[in-house]
Amino acid sequence: MRYCMDFESTLVPLEQELTYVDHYLCFQKARFPGRFVYSIHAAPELREVHIPKMLIQPVVENAFKHGHMQNRPNGFILVVAEYDKDSLVLSVADNGCGADEDALQALRCRMEQKDSGTGVSDHIGLLNLSTRIRLHYGQGALLTFGNRSRGGFEVSIRLPRSEA
């Protein structure tokens, strides 16, 4: 709780953000023992890269809220941070129930129109995240999401390498 309430530091090392995500997932494992496993991967050279605080945890939280990971046997969540050409890519994938394609398309349209979804409570986390990265990094930042071909859902956050 102290981590997210510290308003003095808006940028944190990736290592710190991943530690917070790890603590969140440990807490969820205690709540739902034996229901899922998780893995967090980041190359050592990325661990000191600074990113906006609370960038990854809300996406992981969505795996429980929308993917129903706590209700599925053999659930899996994968968090990866890696460089891809000129971008830092942060991705969260799960093997949950995925999402309805019509709802995904509607959300993509709202993001393209920069519609904050006033009065709408669905997917506010992804809309907020998209707005935050665009405000901080400009048009070079990108949030993508969709169902995985093998089932589940994946969210990728692409940040310009020179700024990350």
Over which residues does each language-model region extend?
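C-terminal end segment of the histidine kinase catalytic
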Residues: N147-A164
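Two-component histidine phosphotransfer core
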Residues: M1-G146, F153-E154
